[in-house]
Design a protein with these regions (language model features):
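A short amphipathic alpha-helical interaction element
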Residues: 220-259, 270-275
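N-terminal nucleophile
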Residues: 2-226
Length: 275
């Protein structure tokens, strides 16, 4: 087998109600997240793999931005590529349409599957079960897009995965102004570049990401009544702080602090743990 093949399995998907597009990927390849996943809010997502053509990422997004469908985008990318027989690509467009392409010279097992709002594909797999697990898990799960993508990735590995083993994994999710301080479109961008169990490590990082940058719905915040306010002041004093915002900033929880009439239960939990 020639060097340079991005032997992998991936799923590209969207949550139109949330305005999110994303890609999850795992491979026996160093730093797969630097090559395979591409996404842009309002345009779509692309996964480029096998003997990956990295240009499929930006060029695919440009086509999607113009209003091309997922299938039209795949057709245009592969038609212009003399190496298409070795390429594999999955695309989801702005309307949730999906398309996947597997070149005739991709190493077995190789193939893909599409459904409402997702494209799943892989090459050099133990069997087709991996792609089926990606698709069926995505269809069967609910909740945030990032969590559905991670669940699909784990199911793909449990079904066999890349027949060469594991090395790296990545998760990319975009949403307009959904990123840090609402000044970025990158909601989640996590990469495990070299690890014996990259999917488990990616799941661990996602949990940390949600702690630091996740958002508890405001209606689940706890009112700062007299008793709770006194507890918070006491906890802060014990740590040497007067302001919850000051402590949260140093604890990397400032995205979860807003006003002084209520407190995010995650912040309260971490404050109690810090005492």
């Amino acid at each position: 087998m020639a060097d340079g093949v991005v032997a992998t399995y991936s799923i590209v998907a969207c949550d139109l109600a949330a305005g999110q597009w994303g890609v999850a990927v795992q491979s026996k390849f160093l730093a797969v997240g630097s090559v395979v996943p591409w996404a842009e809010p309002g345009a779509g997502g692309v996964a480029t793999q096998s003997y990956a053509n990295p240009r499929y990422g930006p060029e695919g997004l440009a086509l999607l931005r113009q209003g091309r469908s997922a299938q039209e985008t795949v057709d245009a990318l592969t038609a212009a590529d003399d190496g298409r027989a070795q390429r594999q690509v999955g695309v989801v467009d702005a309307k949730g349409g999906a398309a996947t392409f597997t070149g005739a010279e991709c190493h077995d097992w190789a193939g893909g599957r599409t459904g409402a709002g997702y494209a799943a594909q892989g090459n050099i797999l133990v069997s087709a079960d991996t792609v089926d697990a990606l698709a069926e898990t995505f269809e069967a799960t609910s909740g945030p897009l990032a969590e559905r993508l991670l669940a699909s990735l784990a199911a793909g590995q449990a079904a066999g995965g890349d027949r060469r083993g594991q090395q790296s994994a990545a998760l990319l999710v975009v949403e307009r102004d959904g990123g840090y301080a609402m000044l970025s479109d990158t909601l989640v961008d996590l990469r495990i570049d070299d690890h014996e169990r990259p999917i488990e490590e990616l799941q661990r990082l996602y949990e940390a990401h949600e702690l630091l940058f996740g958002k508890t719905p405001r209606d689940r915040w706890l009112p700062l009544d007299e008793e709770l306010r006194a507890e918070v002041r006491g906890l802060l004093a014990g740590l040497g702080y007067e302001s919850l915002a000051d402590w949260a900033g140093l604890a990397n929880l400032k995205e979860r602090v807003d006003g002084d009439d209520a407190i995010d239960p995650v912040v309260l939990r971490e404050l109690r743990r810090a005492k």
